[in-house]
Structures are given as C-alpha cells and as structure tokens.
Amino acid sequence: WREPCTISILGDSISSYQASFWRMLKRALRGCPVRFCDHSISGQTSGELFITMYPSIFQSHADLAHLMIGTNDCRRTVDAPHALHTGLEEFEKNVRFLLASLQSGGTRSVVSSIPPVDQQKIDAVFPEYRLEYFEPDRQAFNGVLRRAAEDFGAVFNDMEPVYAAFSPAELTIEDGVHLNGHAHGLLAARVWALFQSIRTEQTAG
C-alpha cells in the first residue's frame, strides 16, 4: 500500500493474541505506510469495548476498522442459571453504537463473525468458571453482527463457510476458545482481501 492508512482493531482476546490475524497482516505490510491501533482487550464484551476504549478508538481517526466481538457476550454461566453474559438486545445496541460512531467518523469497517468454540476443551481447561456455549446463541449473535454491518455501511465477513471445513477442535488452541495459528491464517486471508477491496475504493475516490 502506497497511501498512508490507519487501521483500528476492535475486539477481545482473540484479536489481542500475540499471533493473531491482524499481527500477521502487520508483518505482511511491514515497510508500507500503515499504522495499526489495537483496541482489543482480553475478556472484553461489546459493552466494555465501547465504554473502555471509546475515546482512543475515535482519537485514532482510522481509515479502516476490523470488529470481531461477541465471544464473551454469547457465553452462559451454568450457575447463573444459564444466563447470557450479555443479552441479545444489549449486544445489538452496543454493536450498532460502535458501527454508527465509526461510520460517522469516516471509517470503513469490516465485521467478522464470531468463531466457533470447543466446549469439551473449555470444560477441561476452565472447569471453575462453569462456562457454556450454545450454537444457537452464537448464530443469533452473528445474525446481529450481519444486520448491523448492513445497516451501517460495513462489510460483514462471514467466516462460517471457511470454518465449516474444520471441527472446532481443529480451529482452537487447548482452551477451546482462542483460534489457533491455522484459523488466524484463514481469517487474515479473508480480512486482507476485504481491506484491499475497500482501500482500492478509498484511494480511487
């Protein structure tokens, strides 16, 4: 890329991981006038993302943004009983607020779907947290992301067809939640292609 570009990364620990998809992109773009701003924090929900990171997100004045959030929102705690950590309506409000704010600042966003998890691994590594994920919840939260992206001029990156070729165990590290290097590579390839397309439009305009 020859034109200066700032890219904001919004997410949770899947994005903040030291070997994550966007760090792969950063390495690939070394030497290009591209600046990445990392606004992803481990354990972050959609509500915490905009409350904690709101000032720094919009001080970045990013040309592009990538949002992948919801893994910590769509989980349940067995003893709650079985309560979602973030209700679906609340999640939708949070995501729509973030995307509307990014859009109003002139940032073009890519929204990636929430990846699958491996419950058996989660139970083995985090037994004391009593966490459980249900596939219908993940699909419902991904539906919110898709609709919000469409409403606010963002591009929805539906990774489901790509992930479907592999089991959750093949996509995640030993904790069952975080994507492994292979899965991050798959995600990086898709995000790169979408960023390229959007950036071509921006520089042509």
What are these language model-derived features?
Residues 33-39:
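Short beta-strand elements in bilobed, periplasmic/extracellular small-molecule ligand-binding domains
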Residues 27-32, 48-205:
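Alpha-helical cap/lid subdomain in secreted, periplasmic
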Residues 4-22, 42-45, 74:
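Catalytic nucleophile-elbow at a beta strand-turn-alpha helix junction centered on a G-D-S/GDSL motif
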Residues 39-42, 115:
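Short, solvent-exposed turn/loop segments enriched in Gly/Ser/Thr/Pro and often Arg
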